[in-house]
């Protein structure tokens, strides 16, 4: 090292010597006046000039000086300094070159020779010093800046799936991902949608636009029967309807399109979710009651099993099952159940007790009634009446008492596309009724030998989906694909309870996540696992710089990255099949949507059709009258049921004792 330093010092001395020679030769007359010329030097320089022509131009000695200066700087190891930048080096070097090489004209200025010489020597020296500084700074510059990748992007980028893997069930989304300092094209291949899918993301992250809409379109193209819960009706419904019109060729049997919409009965089919033909056991009535009551009282989800939670559920279940067995289920509708519940409880209990299959079911109520525990009884009944009273609506009664279609949407002989619309302004009312449709559909479609089907629930926490965890766990073998969209896991835990929320999180095979924060981001980061990453550290002291490189396991996609995803950027993982292996299941990419194509398609969309025309022969709109007449008819039918049943019980010697005499 010392030998190298001596060589570099020698080269720098030679460089300075050439500068001195340049000044001596081209400023000779002035130097002679100053008395600093020497005859020996003059002879040596004249000999060089005769043999080499070294001084034929002012540039040659300058070039030799710069060459030796550069060599001396290259071989010099300076103390590294973070504050030295290429910008400073470039500025110093540029100034040095200008001052050092472009100053020959100063010798020709119309000034005294002494002045010309002073200016020339000053600029030459300043230029040389600037170039010397630039060269020295180069040797002290940190060649590898550890702060070039402050967000660790290179370490956390990885190769993703670039193959398009399709089958008759798959959903395939084109992507762009960053890897090895460039953007690459790839694919997210959901080759097994029957293992359920989750789409997470804060509002505006693009989960509906990039994922949910694509699921709807591709599954319709591939002939799926479809059930879609449309929280912001008719956004998803219009997509499903128009895409079906353009892709009917994907179905062996042409499917029918059905709508449930409580806001506008003109654009809604009618369907009875507790149709007697689909209720074979009192357990079905209990499931329906359970779904309704927990949708109306979300706080009960975490209190399942409590006395004042189970009591109203059992009471409503008994009423539903009574309507199922009364006259063959002629009046078995949810509006009839609400109206019957709101009759005098003495009459209701008397009627229900007259049926042996309901007598034991109602024993808690009957015990309280017969022991005159009025406060307890009133509390039990009020727990059922008060929430259900919010659902008393002529429009809701109209939709839920008809039978335009059945809920077995994946019946191979009658496939259906069913969309149900909610309204954020009336969510608390509509969610309970729609939850009933959900629970009935889940039970009817999750069977062997049916058509492949899809259940798409966007904004899942706005509705309580009874049996969802069981559907995810068992639907795969029955070809039922489930897609759930919501904002984050904390929202799901709040509305579904901790236990059910964890089951849903841990049993879903395909996960898409846009921007999410907090615990959800941490959970997802842990799910994606860790990868071996390279770490580089640098130590700088007065004498030298040392660099060490190590590896360690770190998060493939940290929670901080998930918390700051741009709109349209998603992280996630997919599940594969035995015969369709996907080595890299995890993705961190932008889901590519052809915006121009979407705009063109949307521009051609037609509005959802009008289902029922309430116009009479004279052209008058009779919707309100017909809906009100249906409402009044239901109430009258329930009054008549109570009267007929009480009369029957009074006239039956074996049952007349059930009628409690009023004091």
What are these regions (language model features)?
Residues 586-589:
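N-terminal charged/capping segments associated with class I S-adenosyl-L-methionine
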Residues 22, 32, 36, 142-147, ...:
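P-loop NTPase motor domains
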Residues 177-183, 297-307, 535-552:
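Low-complexity, polar-biased intrinsically disordered regions enriched in Pro/Ser/Thr/Gly
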Residues 472-474, 478-575:
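Conserved ATP-driven motor cores of ASCE-family P-loop NTPases powering translocation/secretion/packaging/pilus
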Residues 70-76, 435, 439, 510, ...:
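Hydrophobic alpha-helical segments involved in membrane association or supramolecular assembly
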Residues 32, 67-69, 98-99, 412, ...:
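Short alpha-helix boundary/capping motifs
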Residues 1-205, 209, 214, 541-542, ...:
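Basic- and hydrophobic-enriched, low-structure N-terminal and domain-boundary segments
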């Amino acid at each position: 090292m010392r030998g190298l330093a001596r060589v570099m010092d020698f080269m720098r001395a030679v460089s300075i010597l050439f500068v001195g020679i340049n000044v001596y030769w081209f400023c000779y007359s002035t130097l002679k006046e100053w008395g600093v010329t020497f005859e020996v030097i003059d002879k040596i320089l004249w000999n060089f000039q005769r043999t080499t022509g070294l001084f034929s131009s002012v540039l040659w000695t300058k070039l030799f000086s710069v060459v030796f200066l550069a060599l001396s700087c290259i071989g010099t190891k300076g103390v590294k300094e973070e504050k030295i930048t290429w910008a400073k080096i470039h500025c110093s070097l540029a100034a040095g070159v200008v001052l050092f090489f472009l100053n020959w004209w100063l010798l020709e200025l119309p000034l005294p020779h002494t002045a010309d010489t002073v200016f020339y020597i000053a600029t030459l020296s300043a230029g040389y010093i600037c170039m010397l500084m630039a060269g020295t700074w180069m040797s002290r510059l940190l060649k590898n800046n550890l702060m070039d990748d402050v967000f660790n992007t290179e370490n956390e980028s990885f190769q993703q799936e670039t193959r398009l893997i399709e089958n008759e069930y798959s959903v395939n989304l084109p992507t762009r991902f960053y890897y090895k300092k460039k953007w690459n094209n790839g694919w997210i291949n959901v080759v097994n949608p029957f293992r359920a899918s989750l789409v997470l993301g804060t509002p505006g992250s693009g989960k509906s636009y990039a994922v949910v809409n694509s699921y709807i379109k591709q599954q319709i193209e591939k002939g799926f029967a479809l059930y879609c819960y449309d929280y912001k009706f008719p956004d998803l419904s219009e997509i499903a309807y128009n895409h079906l019109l353009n892709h009917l060729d994907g179905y062996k049997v042409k499917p029918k399109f059905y709508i449930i919409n409580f806001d506008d009965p003109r654009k809604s089919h009618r369907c009875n979710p507790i149709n007697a033909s689909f209720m074979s056991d009192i357990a079905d009535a209990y499931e329906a009651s359970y779904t309704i009551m927990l949708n109306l009282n979300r706080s009960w989800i975490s209190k399942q099993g409590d006395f004042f939670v189970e009591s109203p559920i059992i009471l409503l279940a008994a009423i539903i099952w009574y309507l199922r067995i009364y006259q063959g289920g002629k009046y078995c509708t949810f509006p009839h159940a609400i109206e019957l519940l709101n009759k005098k409880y003495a009459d209701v209990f008397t009627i229900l007790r007259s049926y042996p299959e309901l007598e034991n079911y109602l024993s808690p109520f009957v015990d309280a009634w017969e022991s005159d525990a009025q406060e307890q009884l009133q509390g039990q009944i009020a727990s059922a009446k008060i929430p259900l009273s919010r659902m008393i609506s002529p429009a809701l009664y109209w939709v839920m008492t008809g039978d335009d279609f059945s809920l077995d949407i994946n019946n191979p002989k009658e496939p259906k596309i069913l969309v149900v619309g909610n309204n954020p302004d009336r969510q608390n009312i509509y969610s309970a009724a729609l939850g009933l449709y959900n629970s009935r559909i889940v039970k009817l479609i999750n069977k062997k030998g049916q058509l492949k089907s899809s259940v798409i629930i966007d904004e899942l926490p706005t509705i309580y989906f009874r049996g969802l965890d069981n559907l995810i766990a068992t639907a795969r073998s029955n070809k039922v694909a489930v897609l759930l969209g919501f904002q984050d896991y904390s929202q799901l835990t709040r509305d579904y309870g901790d236990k059910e929320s964890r089951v849903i999180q841990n049993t879903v095979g395909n996960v898409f996540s846009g921007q999410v924060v907090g615990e959800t981001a941490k959970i997802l980061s842990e799910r994606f696992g860790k990868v071996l990453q390279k770490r580089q550290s640098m130590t700088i002291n007065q004498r030298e710089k040392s660099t060490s490189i190590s590896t360690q396991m770190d998060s493939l996609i940290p929670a901080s990255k998930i918390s700051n995803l741009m709109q349209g950027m998603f992280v996630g993982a997919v599940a594969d099949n035995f015969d369709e292996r996907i080595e890299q299941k995890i993705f961190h990419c932008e889901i590519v949507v052809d915006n121009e194509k979407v705009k063109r398609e949307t521009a051609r969309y037609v509005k959802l059709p009008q289902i029922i025309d309430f116009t009479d022969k004279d052209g008058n709109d009779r919707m309100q009258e017909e809906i009100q007449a249906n409402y009044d008819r239901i109430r009258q039918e329930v009054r008549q049921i109570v009267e007929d049943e009480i009369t029957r019980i009074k006239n039956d010697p074996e049952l007349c004792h059930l009628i409690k005499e009023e004091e």
